[in-house]
Design a protein with these regions (language model features):
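Catalytic His-Asp segment of secreted/periplasmic serine-dependent ester chemistry enzymes
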Residues: 7, 185-263
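Cell-envelope and extracellular/periplasmic
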Residues: 54-56, 60-62, 67-78, 107-113, ...
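Active-site segments of SGNH/GDSL-like serine hydrolases
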Residues: 141-147, 168-203
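Mature catalytic domains of secreted/periplasmic carbohydrate-active enzymes
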Residues: 97-103, 159-162, 173, 181, ...
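Serine-esterase "nucleophile elbow" of acetyl-processing enzymes
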Residues: 38-108, 123-130
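Alpha-helix N-cap and loop-to-helix initiation/capping positions
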Residues: 78-82, 151-159, 195-203
Length: 263
């Protein structure tokens, strides 16, 4: 059996920093687009084709302050509608690299949401778009809100996984040709993230990975990425509160998302 290179062995300090489009100019961007820059992160799949609709879904990490103005959110490739986070930066990278492909990219992340809240709005905010590629990043609120007694949320990892499976099954029934991307929930050990998150948070990550595997989705291991990133800059550099990525964190996510979908 051929083994994938490990995260730590595949990346030198220089190689890792080259994968960040923040770090360097044109030469760095060229290096970042090569498969050699991060072989452990490439899924080997080519998900994005011409004239496709790409939809980002999730919570505040995806939302990233996007506009709620219908004219802006219903227009593809619109910066206010895409927000200020990784979804916008991933869209920008796709649109720079594939200017003639007619891609239409949307963001429907909503701050604070958990899996069951995605399900409540799924018809209008996902299925009606008929996306060709759907990317979901969800899970941090499913644990975070359960840790805050003031919110009185009684969620568990079992509820999270059950609801996630149901959401994906519903989506794949409605859109049988859909290409699905499941992003790994992640946190960094700073800010709002304390020891009480663990080891339970790792169970949520494992659940998301099982959902991806069962439904043949491309899995984007963001936690693995940030676990390497903190070797070269402190956690606060990537996400000041441990949950919401900084500009550097969002840019790193965007670049590796694009790598993972083979675009």
């Amino acid at each position: 059996m051929k083994h994938e290179p490990s995260v730590t062995s595949a990346l030198s300090r220089r190689g890792f920093l080259k994968t960040s489009t923040l770090a360097l100019g044109t030469a760095g961007l060229a290096a970042a687009t090569s498969a050699e820059a991060a072989p452990w992160f490439s899924s080997g799949r080519k998900l994005v084709a011409k004239n496709q609709v790409i939809l980002f879904q999730g919570d505040s990490i995806t939302d990233a302050g996007r506009s709620r103005d219908k004219e802006k959110t219903n227009a593809p490739n619109n910066q206010p509608g895409l927000g200020n986070g990784y979804a916008w930066l991933a869209a920008a990278e796709l649109l720079v690299g594939r200017p003639d492909d007619g891609l239409k990219i949307f963001n429907r992340g909503i701050s604070g949401h958990k899996v069951f809240q995605l399900a409540d709005r799924w018809q209008a905010d996902c299925l009606d778009f008929k996306p060709d590629v759907l990317s979901i990043l969800i899970g941090v609120n499913d644990i975070w809100h359960s840790l805050d007694p003031k919110l009185n949320y009684k969620g568990t990892v079992e509820i999270y996984e059950r609801d996630y499976h149901a959401l994906v099954e519903r989506t794949q029934r409605a859109l049988p040709k859909l290409k699905l991307v499941v992003c790994e929930p992640f946190v960094l050990r700073c800010g709002a993230v304390s020891d009480k998150w663990f080891p339970e948070f790792d169970r949520y990550r494992a659940a998301a990975k099982r959902v991806a595997a069962q439904h043949h989705a491309t899995f984007v291991p963001f936690q693995a990425m940030f676990d390497v990133a903190v070797k070269y800059a402190p956690p606060e550099h990537w996400a000041g509160d441990g949950v919401h990525p900084s500009p550097a964190g969002a840019a790193l996510m965007a670049h590796f998302w694009v790598k993972a979908v083979g675009a």
